[in-house]
Amino acid sequence: MSNQEVLLKVENLCQYFGMQGSELKAVDNVSFDIKKGEVFGLVGESGCGKTTTGRSIIKLYNITGGNIFFKGIRISAGKRGYQEAIKKAREDYKAAVAANPEKKVQLKAEMDKTIAEQTKAMKEAIFDQNNCDKEYSKRLQEACKMKYEALLARASDSEKAALTRSSRTRCARLARPSW
């Protein structure tokens, strides 16, 4: 896979915007490669610069710094060859989809299946955590109740004081479960 052609290479991309005498660093030193046939995702929190990165790559913004290479050719702002290459890539994609619509449907089905599996796994993990929390809470309440009963026994009856040690041990064991 490392021998695959690099379609898009982004090196130290910077996109700054001037705002009332100061600079907003929307994108700062972002680098990545996208190889032919590779599925690439740019993910992050809201407002972290994903859209700005994309817009900078397709030249909706003149980049502040860094380099962008498309099929090995360095792209400069507004370069006609780059715009033609992007246009051709879009046409190639549309032609590929038109020639094989089943592939697009199959890919969507696979993506939906993967998302459903991940959602199910997350729900199961949350359910397990909730059950674990409930069990821990129940054990802690039982342990505290036994400790309270042991204290009452110690205060009221010297014979019951012998039970205090064993219930304290049980209380400690229940309050700190092994999981």
Task: Please provide the spans of the model-predicted regions.
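ABC transporter nucleotide-binding domains
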Residues: 1-179
